[in-house]
Amino acid sequence: MPQKNAQDRLWKILTPVLLVLAVLAMAKTLFVGLEIDEEYAFSLGFRLVKGDRLFYTMWEPHQLSALPAALVLALYTAIAGTTTGALLFVRAVVLVCKAAMSAVFYRDFKQTIGRHGALLSAVVLFVYTPKWFLGPDYISQQFHFTVAAFLCFYHYYTHGFRRPWLVVLGAVCVCFSFLAFPQSALAAAVIFIGMVLLGRRGKEPTICKIPRGAVLFVLGCMACAAAFLAYVLPGMGLTVFLQRVSLILNDPQYDFTTSQRLALLASQALNTAKFLAKPLAASVVLCLLWWAKTRQKRDWIGLALNLWAILAALLCVVRAVADSSSDERYFMPALVLAAAWAFRKGRGTVREPLFWLGFLPGMAAYAFILRSTLLGFSATFMYLTWPALCGCFAMLARRQMEPEQEKLPQGQCVLAALLVFLLVCRFWCVLVTGWKPANVATANLKQITAGPAAGTWADEKAANMQMALYEALEPFAGKQVLQAIGEQHGLGFMMAGGTLTIGQASVISGTDSDPRFIQYYEELPEKRPDVILYDEAEVRDMAAFHAWIEENFTITARYPVTHGTAHLQVLVVD
């Protein structure tokens, strides 16, 4: 009892401290930093707001993630009548949604994993975003809609199969997750199997001898698919739709085979293994010394795995500070292995729904994402965060249900190490264009005073570019714009108060001259631009596309726009 009272007193102090730190960290993220991936998410949504159509006039590889961003941007433009300041608004909406999700998590899990564990977990969920920014890009949507779907399913299966509408709502959320990253749709099969097993073991009411939740899940997904096709197909037809899908799937950036992808991953895995070997060795040595001293009978493998994850996470904290990089997630494989171990002997316990509805679908999604993404091996670890967190919840649940077997708060310690990593990266690192290392001490931050990013602070290069885009495009209200630039500036399309339209096949960054750019204007002549932008500091090979532009468009005027380090060239088209 005295020990419990001491823990309660400690948590009375820790609770407000954690909440204040989390709020301050996310407030910094709300106002500071800008990266082109976040801009890309905004420009996708803006295309829908301005009347572009999925697959028909949008040839984007990630266009299926455009719907949520479009809804929020449409709301803002309807209220404000402009896109000025839209970045802050959308970030704030995402932040409010994250806070609500964390609150729901705490409410539903405080009995299962304890109040303190639920609080720590909720704070981690609030502070975490896959790419650190708050903009609703496709990776962030895949994570957050997955969590939202899980919360719906988990409540239904752990509260006596009441409120079946939650399964339908969860199906809608999971469909948005699949739209954001279609390769993760394999998780649907795992979720269905889990629902059938959980339903039969829990004596759930059935429909046609199939557990009700599984049936509602399938019907909900089918309804979403039908609604999506009803939205996309009118005016285009199935034949054109399939042609567009084939065209987009043949994106030159993704032109690699499974064997080529596996070979690349294998070559990169060695560096991760070298990094993880040190904390693993330290964990094994510490556990052996502990065992030699106490000779206790306990789960030494689980303890070693958890200690490995903790040490690896703390080592990543040191690297993040030293390198000023928030991309130090090498600890995640260790955390996933510790998570997998936490689910052993979980059948019939409160851990079972966590396994079937959270951990296993997350691992299935990761397997297919790993094959299809362009990211390097260590960068893909962000997709392991959700299954890893489910394992942490399982550790907390086991200790809550079996306090005599699990006296050490291992789950809390693992989550605490993860939270330290997240908070250090949030406070110390600054997002800059190109994911280059930067921190609050060295980044030359400037306030952006005009355009959709008005009111935020970014590194000097990004801030200057936003102001140059504003100055270059302000005279062209209502015109159609083409950025013939390899590194696209998505917020540039939202200049001139949101009156511009987008006149190009794709707004994704990182592409060299692509023959589909030319095909786009041949098939859709109405998308020919009125104004074209070049970047004098072009980092991609756009020579072929620029040559085609000069030959096929009548350029009536050409002039430079410079703002600090940003140098644009404006071409006016007849």
Sequence positions of predicted segments:
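Short periplasmic/luminal acceptor-recognition loop of GT-C membrane glycosyltransferases, typified by
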Residues: 60, 188, 427-509, 530-540, ...
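Short acidic/glycine- and proline-prone juxtamembrane loop motifs at membrane-interface regions
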Residues: 134-143
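Perimembrane helix-loop-helix junctions
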Residues: 158, 187-225, 258-259, 289-295
